Amino acid sequence: STIGKSIIGLEPVTSGKVLYEGQDVTNKARRRTSDYNRNVQMIFQDSLSSFNPKKRILDIVAEPLRNFDRLSPEEERRKVIELMEIIGLSEEALLKYPHQFSGGQRQRIGVARALASNPRLIIADEPVSALDLSVQAQVLNYMKRIQDEFNLSYLFISHDLGVVKHMCDELFIMYRGRFVETGKADDIYANPQHIYTKRLLSAIPVIDPVNREANKQRRIEAEKFYQENQTMYYDENGRVFDLQQLSDSHFVALNPSAKGGN
């Protein structure tokens, strides 16, 4: 979340760089350019607090249009109606206020607002973590369809690797502010190497009453291995090791002297 907010300028960067299309976007002058602000948008975790409660949905979704495009009131309204249709809401929603919608509807409106400037990258910060499972699936399906239709990229931030599996082609697993494992989806889900990745994967709920005990035992064994082998993953100060390359696409933060994982 901190990285995502730093990319769009909501959090200060104390060290390091973030490159977007070869440009350092932690440079304030670069980040303030109109093209960059148009091309990089964000969907926030808490949709209610990210909307001005005094504004109607028409004004909320139209805000990027007013910042970047010079449209007549009629063109603006028509564009907002098109965006609402994309997320499955009708024109009637335009004159309502944020509190009059469900959490899932508000999050879809957040998607529409992010989409209004026709961005190339949308940072999605835990966009479905506050929603129940059925609504999560609905919002994710809208996001996936929009991604294909508009040919845009997501920086999808989540603690739930079950959700991530549905959305992402490449994964970057972070712990204590550092990457502990990166790779293609197949690398991470079929061959996880860092214990933190394994712990996240073991936390994915599995509807499998037949193998419930076996799944529970695997989680216990992973925790036991972690407790007994922490030096494989962290130095004496608890710092994450640097990434080591396992394949063309798979990197993991292991002790360079370690021989394999669990």
Predicted regions mapped to residue ranges:
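Helix-to-loop junction immediately C-terminal to a conserved catalytic motif
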Residues: 8
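Conserved ABC transporter NBD signature motif
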Residues: 16-24, 36
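Conserved ABC ATPase "signature" region
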Residues: 24, 74-92, 201
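A short, proline-enriched helix->beta-strand linker immediately N-terminal to the Walker B motif
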Residues: 116-120
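A short, surface-exposed alpha-helical micro-motif characterized by mixed small hydrophobic
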Residues: 164-166
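ABC ATPase "signature
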Residues: 179-183
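Short catalytic/signature loops enriched in Gly
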Residues: 185-261
